[in-house]
């Protein structure tokens, strides 16, 4: 069914655009971890300097900024401002706090000044954006690569304006949003389908989603056409055909695309887009996600035969990805009412999203390392303008969005979060109470003005074998299976009470394709353990370029607790874990954690902060572990030594490391060999990075090459324009493996805090692939 209906004026734009959702203001969070997180996030949002967030927009509109722009992540100026506008709207809708509305109104008025000054509907903060947009309109697609993901950037402003109307009812923001959409359509109108596809090779956020929403608002076909034009067929067509082509792809480039595909499927009843969305969700949630619901490492989907990198890399699942996977899950649920989407939503919400907010100062998390005994770092207000700060601003105001849904006379309970629902259309109030998941009981009390008939649909979670339900103390005769909904159809009276019992059991989940690493799960809760509080370098991040990464020393897996035994023995030992008195969801496992680890407690991962932790555990029989120790310990020691010596490192061909190092390039391309990314340059082209010797005397430059390059592969390496090495790679080693070469850095180089390292090709030649570039201590 096509749901687009042409929305003119509505008291509840959220419900008009998403008919099965309740307005955030109609779902009140009651006392719980979620309500506390929401309240804390309001305090954090109010600490941000709005004029500094607005400065990039004013500058690009030719107006005088009222404050300086934030310096962190310069080049992506304006993206966090869009997220912040969304966050204000969401939290205002959820709490009614007038301070949030005051800020939202101010932002909209300032953005309106910017849009009016532009004269063409544009309102964005992309630095020096006019030459870009003019060039794109004239067909110069290559220009996007000279900017930092500009469509991704402006998408945040599109979403912010839409959300100010969607959640907070601001009609001026809606008008601005549609004018901005018209500007976007004007930019892409002259472009051929081939040019669009080439442009969409770069990250562009959720552009198809916002145009699909513009269509849902207006029923003007031009916006739906725009949404389809922003559909990257490289991904859309493969997903619709059931082909997984996600290995080594930047994860949060792909997920927002599919959020858009789902939205197009929803508003246009398009089966191709629906099939693509479902297959993508099944692929990512089923084979490319960790137990907490997060995905990716170093921002990329791991290749299926290298998933061990999930537990070896310091850069684990990115928070933005999970934010968008929740949007996708919610959308697919709206189309299908399939409980599996709600099960995934619950897992990701309880274990990843909750964990990305510090419970005291409210800082946001970028990466959640799954490597044993590593840790997370946190943002602070007015510093670190990361993408995950932007989505972090939004996350904690939306906890009420998916607790309940309604379809006709059916009320779906999707999440077990203490809350009070005001179902105005039915004159029904439902109050949900309990201390789930610390306690396995949940209660619902119905309050109606007069008896009302509706069907209460209670989610039977996939992790619960035997859900028990009573109405007014009497067991219901209806049965249900795990990962489904139990229906109670009756005429409800004031004071009717429904009680659920949700027995939880312990289980283990493996890293995808890596059975030797397991995570412990209890019901929907991932249990982890605190390892230590030592070496938490950069725990609260500053404005430095890479402060979102936990740069403290890595711990050898051989210095962490290992779960010894067969899988059956380990699961059996976990089944006998002992609750810790006075500490809900804390357990000791004396049959597994012994000796110096005997005092370790398993507890909800989302509750562990300011500490190194064990989220995944190496798990083997004693014989296998003894053999593994002999084979891998030396290699692990070498890897950790290189990590310890590394001052700065770039992974060529990977988006964020290159952006973080201010890459410049001409005649350059990227690819993968043996699942390792590379970059090269040809025919006099080059690529360069800003790198930091940090004053380290005797520092070395290490460059990784492929050991069997064909003819015509020659690279010249320059630092600050001075040639330091020239390599003819053709036939140099003649081996099919990677080779790392070391180059001594002159003292004048190491005395600098930062230098430009350039890889230059010769005329009619090619540099060969460069796979890793790092500056290390001697």
Locations of the language-model features?
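Aromatic (Trp/Tyr) and acidic
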Residues: 14-98, 102, 133-167, 204-222, ...
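Solvent-exposed beta-hairpin/edge-strand motifs
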Residues: 459-471, 716-719
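Bacterial N-terminal signal peptides
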Residues: 1-8
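Solenoidal tandem-repeat scaffolds enriched in leucines and small polar residues
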Residues: 181, 188, 194, 198-233, ...
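Aromatic-lined ligand-binding clefts that engage carbohydrates, nucleic acids, or primary amines
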Residues: 455-461, 703-709
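Beta-strand-rich ligand-recognition modules
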Residues: 475-495, 501-515, 668-698, 704-778
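Asp-box/WD-like beta-propeller blade repeats and closely related beta-sheet repeat scaffolds
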Residues: 129-148, 174-198
């Amino acid at each position: 069914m096509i749901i687009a209906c042409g929305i003119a004026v509505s008291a509840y734009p959220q419900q008009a655009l998403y008919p099965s959702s309740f307005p955030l203001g109609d779902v009140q969070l009651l006392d719980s971890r979620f309500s506390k997180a929401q309240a804390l996030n309001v305090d954090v949002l109010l600490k941000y300097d709005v004029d500094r967030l607005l400065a990039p927009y004013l500058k690009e509109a030719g107006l005088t900024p009222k404050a300086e722009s934030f310096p962190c992540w310069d080049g992506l100026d304006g993206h966090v401002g869009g997220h912040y506008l969304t966050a204000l709207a969401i939290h205002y809708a959820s709490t009614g706090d007038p301070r949030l509305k005051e800020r939202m109104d101010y932002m909209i008025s300032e953005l309106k000044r910017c849009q009016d000054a532009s004269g063409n509907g544009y309102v964005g903060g992309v630095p020096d954006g006019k030459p870009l947009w003019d060039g794109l309109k004239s067909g110069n697609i290559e220009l996007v690569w000279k900017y930092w993901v500009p469509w991704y950037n402006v998408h945040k402003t599109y979403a912010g304006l839409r959300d100010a109307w969607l959640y907070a009812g601001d009609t001026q923001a809606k008008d601005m949003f549609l004018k901005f959409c018209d500007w976007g359509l004007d930019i892409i109108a002259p472009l051929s389908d081939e040019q669009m596809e080439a442009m969409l090779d770069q990250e562009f956020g959720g552009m198809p989603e916002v145009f699909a929403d513009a269509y849902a608002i207006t029923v003007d076909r031009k916006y739906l056409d725009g949404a389809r034009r922003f559909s990257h067929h490289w991904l859309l067509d493969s997903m619709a055909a059931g082909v997984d082509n996600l290995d080594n792809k930047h994860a949060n480039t792909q997920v927002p695309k599919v959020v858009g595909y789902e939205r197009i499927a929803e508003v246009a009843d398009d089966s191709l887009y629906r099939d693509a969305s479902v297959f993508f969700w099944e692929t990512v949630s089923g084979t490319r996600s960790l137990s907490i619901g997060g995905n990716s490492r170093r921002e990329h989907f791991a290749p299926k035969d290298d998933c061990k990198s999930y537990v070896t890399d310091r850069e684990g699942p990115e928070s933005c990805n999970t934010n968008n996977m929740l949007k996708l899950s919610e959308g697919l649920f709206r189309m299908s009412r399939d409980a599996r989407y709600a099960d995934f939503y619950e897992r990701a919400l309880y274990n990843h999203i909750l964990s990305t907010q510090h419970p005291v100062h409210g800082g946001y998390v970028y990466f959640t390392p799954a490597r044993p005994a590593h840790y997370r770092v946190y943002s602070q207000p007015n510093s670190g303008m990361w993408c995950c700060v932007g989505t972090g601003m939004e996350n904690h105001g939306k906890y009420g969005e998916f607790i309940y849904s309604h379809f006709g006379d059916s009320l779906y309970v999707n999440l077990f979060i203490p809350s009070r629902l005001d179902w105005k259309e039915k004159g029904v109030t439902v109050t949900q109470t309990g201390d789930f998941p610390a306690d396995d009981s949940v209660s619902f009390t119905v309050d109606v003005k007069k008896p009302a008939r509706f069907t209460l649909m209670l989610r039977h979670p996939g992790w619960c074998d035997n859900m028990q339900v009573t109405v007014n103390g009497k067991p219901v005769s209806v049965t249900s299976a795990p990962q489904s909904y139990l229906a109670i159809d009756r005429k409800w009276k004031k004071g009717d009470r429904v009680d659920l019992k949700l027995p939880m059991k312990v289980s283990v989940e493996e890293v995808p394709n890596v059975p030797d690493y397991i995570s412990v799960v209890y019901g929907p809760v991932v249990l982890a353990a605190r390892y230590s509080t030592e070496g938490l370098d950069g725990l609260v991040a500053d404005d430095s370029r890479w402060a979102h990464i936990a740069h403290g020393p890595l711990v050898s897996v051989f210095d962490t607790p290992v779960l010894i035994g067969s899988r059956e023995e380990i699961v059996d030992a976990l089944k006998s874990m002992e609750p810790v008195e006075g500490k809900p969801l804390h357990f000791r496992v004396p049959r597994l954690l012994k000796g110096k680890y005997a005092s370790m407690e398993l507890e909800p991962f989302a509750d562990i902060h300011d500490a190194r932790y064990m989220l995944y555990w190496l798990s083997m029989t004693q014989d296998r572990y003894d053999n593994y120790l002999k084979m891998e310990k030396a290699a692990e020691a070498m890897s950790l030594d290189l990590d310890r010596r590394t001052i700065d490192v770039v992974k060529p061909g990977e988006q964020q490391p290159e952006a973080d190092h201010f890459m410049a390039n001409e005649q350059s391309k990227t690819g993968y060999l043996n699942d390792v990314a590379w970059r090269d340059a040809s025919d006099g082209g080059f690529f360069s990075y800003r790198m930091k010797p940090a004053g380290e005397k005797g520092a070395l430059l290490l460059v990784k090459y492929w050991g069997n390059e064909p003819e015509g592969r020659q690279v010249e390496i320059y630092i600050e324009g001075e040639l330091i090495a020239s390599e003819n790679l053709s036939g140099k080693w003649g081996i099919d493996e990677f080779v790392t070469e070391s180059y001594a850095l002159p003292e004048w180089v190491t005395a600098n805090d930062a230098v430009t390292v350039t890889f230059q090709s010769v005329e009619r030649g090619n540099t060969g692939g460069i796979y890793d570039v790092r500056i290390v201590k001697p």
